């Protein structure tokens, strides 16, 4: 959704408030385990609130061993908890500035670059069917073409969930 709309903001606040429920961990695990997809991204908006929230995420990951989890974050304090991180969770520290180098002190990171090239995450040119369009084709697309194709999908790429991929670079948009 578009985060400027009140209905979306209200839903975000409800999700935040739900973290206080003692049923949250079990409910999240049930929902994740019921999905066909075996990858899960935490937070399309927002971040880890505090240590209790992080521990709940760890608990959900432990209850969903068949799912690979990815947690993007800008919360540097989380680094102290990396030794406790479940094996099926990749925590990527996001560099806060465009064209900033990946923080060397984190095992897995993400960066944003002002250049679009084939080394970047292909989501910006991947449509809803999973087709990855070439850079050349993308550069010729109109705004309307891009909207119709519904670009911005992962397709078959799973780099964000792969702990062997040290940094994922996203093109600025």
Residue ranges and their predicted role:
Residues 1-173:
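Class I S-adenosyl-L-methionine
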């Amino acid at each position: 959704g578009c985060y400027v709309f009140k209905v979306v903001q209200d839903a975000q606040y409800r999700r935040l408030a739900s973290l206080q429920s003692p049923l949250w961990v079990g409910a999240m695990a049930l929902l994740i385990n019921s999905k066909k997809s075996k990858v899960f991204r935490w937070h399309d908006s927002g971040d880890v609130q505090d240590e209790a929230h992080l521990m709940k995420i760890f608990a959900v990951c432990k209850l969903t061993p068949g799912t690979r989890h990815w947690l993007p974050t800008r919360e540097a304090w989380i680094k102290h908890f990396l030794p406790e991180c479940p094996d099926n969770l990749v925590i990527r520290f996001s560099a806060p500035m465009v064209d900033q180098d990946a923080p060397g002190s984190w095992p897995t990171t993400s960066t944003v670059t002002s250049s679009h090239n084939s080394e970047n995450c292909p989501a910006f040119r991947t449509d809803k069917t999973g087709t990855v369009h070439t850079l050349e084709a993308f550069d010729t697309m109109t705004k309307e073409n891009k909207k119709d194709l519904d670009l911005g999908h992962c397709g078959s790429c799973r780099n964000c969930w792969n702990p062997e991929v040290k940094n994922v670079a996203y093109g600025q948009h």
